[in-house]
Amino acid sequence: CDVTAAPTLIQKCKDAGNVPIIFFNKEITDYDVINSYENAYQVTSTGGDYGASIQAQMVIDYWKEHPEMDKNGDGKLQLVYLMGDPGHTASQPRCDYLKSTIEDAGIEIDLLAEDTGMWVTATAKEKMDAWVSKYGDEIECCVAGNDAMALGALSAVEAAGFNTDGEESSKYIPIYGIDALPEILSKIESGEITGSVLQDAKTQGQTIVKMAENLTSGKDAVDGIEGVETEEEAKAVRVPYQAITKDNLDLAKSTYE
């Protein structure tokens, strides 16, 4: 739901006899709202970076393991970044944490271009088409705020002759997304996409169901729930993000079984 609707939904639950409510996906960052009702909880992914630090670590690891990524040998990462909808709570943090994490690892970023792809494949392709036309093989890395935009970026670079044979391509731009959607996993397997971040919807769903069972049976909300983090102030149960590369595709695939 729209997080601004949370107070209204909470009031409805109070009026209905103090019915428990569990919010998920979009975090309610105004903790006064979530703490205004003892039977309100939220299930989200870990951290305020929305997976960007893990995404950045994949870029850092690739940079260190593949010296050829520094195409012009200047010691800087020539980066293009596709941001999500500016109105979404995850968009700016993903962008900011991505860049700060890379820079904190001692890698200087030369940001060639940054724009919003609005979470949409077609919009991201349009942006990347323009960037590839302008910068071509100067681009050393493309990072997108979600997988849909990463797929749009891939479509653009492949149309320009990049990434067509995965990492063995004569012209290659590492591309990273977030979500580890089923449609991107085959692209990671082929090397056309370099990595993604799993926002574990399966575990989130299982956690929500277990919490609902607990709350309706008078137990503590997180009783018997393992492998998650809790934050008392936010009344949040957080499911960890996971980096997904060729090396652990089975982890992502298992969430869709």
Predicted features by range, described:
Residues C1-V19, Y97-L98, L112-K187:
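Hydrophobic alpha-helical
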Residues L9-Y50, M69, G73-G75, P182-E189, ...:
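Flexible loop/hinge segments that line or gate small-molecule binding clefts
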Residues N25-T29, D85, G117, I178-L181:
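Short glycine-enriched loops at secondary-structure junctions
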Residues Q42-K76, A124-K125, A180-I184, D200-D220:
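Hydrophobic alpha-helical segments within soluble ligand-binding/sensing domains
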Residues G51-M58, T89-E108, T123, K127, ...:
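Short, solvent-exposed amphipathic alpha-helices that sit
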Residues G75-Q78, L82-P86, S100-T101, D200-E257:
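Hinge/cleft segment of the Venus flytrap/periplasmic-binding protein
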Residues Q78-Y81, E103-T121:
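Short beta-strand elements in bilobed, periplasmic/extracellular small-molecule ligand-binding domains
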